[in-house]
């Protein structure tokens, strides 16, 4: 069986804010639907051949269904990513050295979920 990962769903009580945040991080907008009860938008996680992230609204009275934590490898460019995030106007803690000697950057999105860059 040959399966390919196509994307993931993000659910948020503030989907437009999440959408704008990830656009500021540099995610390419694949599709943006006019606001409705569901709010549908798709952002490319990397390039046009890679997976997408769909952003959906959590219906009134419902809880966040799951965790939305992302993990990215930077090919040794953690500090460059950090500078790009800062220049986009996003508050971001500085990268740090791990006990194994690598460098990591942990960012939190407006819903409080973790984005880890290594």
Could you tell me what each predicted segment is?
Residues 59-61, 94-95:
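Short, flexible, glycine/charge-rich loop motifs used to bind or transfer phosphoryl groups or to couple energy/partner
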């Amino acid at each position: 069986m040959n399966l390919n990962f196509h994307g993931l769903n993000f659910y948020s009580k503030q989907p437009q804010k999440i959408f704008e945040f990830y656009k500021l991080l540099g995610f390419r907008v694949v599709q943006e639907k006019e606001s409705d009860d569901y709010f549908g938008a798709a952002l490319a996680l990397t390039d046009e051949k890679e997976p997408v992230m769909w952003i959906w609204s959590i219906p009134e009275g419902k809880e966040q269904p799951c965790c939305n934590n992302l993990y990215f490898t930077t090919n040794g460019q953690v500090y460059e990513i950090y500078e790009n995030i800062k220049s986009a106007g996003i508050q971001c803690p500085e990268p740090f050295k791990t006990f194994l000697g690598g460098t990591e950057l942990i960012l939190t999105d407006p819903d409080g979920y973790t984005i880890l860059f290594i």
